């Protein structure tokens, strides 16, 4: 029998406000998501240490 792929996949989250600010560097987080429960792209509010505030981080491909 063939082994099935797991439902959990690893994704990378990138800050959306950081690009607009023009500051050097980038804020990224890696996390896991369940493919069956959240099929669309993940959006979380995470801390950006460069901007020193909580910002929206979206899943990148």
UniProtKB/Swiss-Prot annotation:
Protein keywords? Ribonucleoprotein, Ribosomal protein
**Highest taxon, organism lineage:** Bacteria
User: Would you name any one GO CC term?
Assistant: ribonucleoprotein complex
What GO terms in the biological process aspect are recorded for it? translation
Q: Which Gene3D superfamilies match?
A: Ribosomal protein L33
- Molecular function as annotated in GO: structural constituent of ribosome
Kindly list the residue ranges recorded as spanning the membrane.
none
Instruction: Output the InterPro entries linked to this UniProt entry.
Output: Ribosomal_bL33 (IPR001705), Ribosomal_bL33_sf (IPR038584), Ribosomal_zn-bd (IPR011332)
Q: Which HAMAP family match?
A: Ribosomal_bL33 (MF_00294)
Which family, according to UniProt?
Belongs to the bacterial ribosomal protein bL33 family.
Protein name, as recorded: Large ribosomal subunit protein bL33
From which source organism is this entry? Answer: Amoebophilus asiaticus (strain 5a2)
């Amino acid at each position: 029998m063939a082994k099935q792929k797991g439902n959990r996949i690893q994704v990378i989250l990138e800050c959306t406000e950081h690009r607009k600010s023009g500051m050097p560097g980038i804020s990224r987080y890696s996390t896991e998501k369940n493919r069956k429960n959240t099929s669309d792209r993940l959006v979380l509010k995470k801390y950006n240490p460069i901007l020193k505030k909580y910002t929206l981080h979206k899943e990148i491909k």
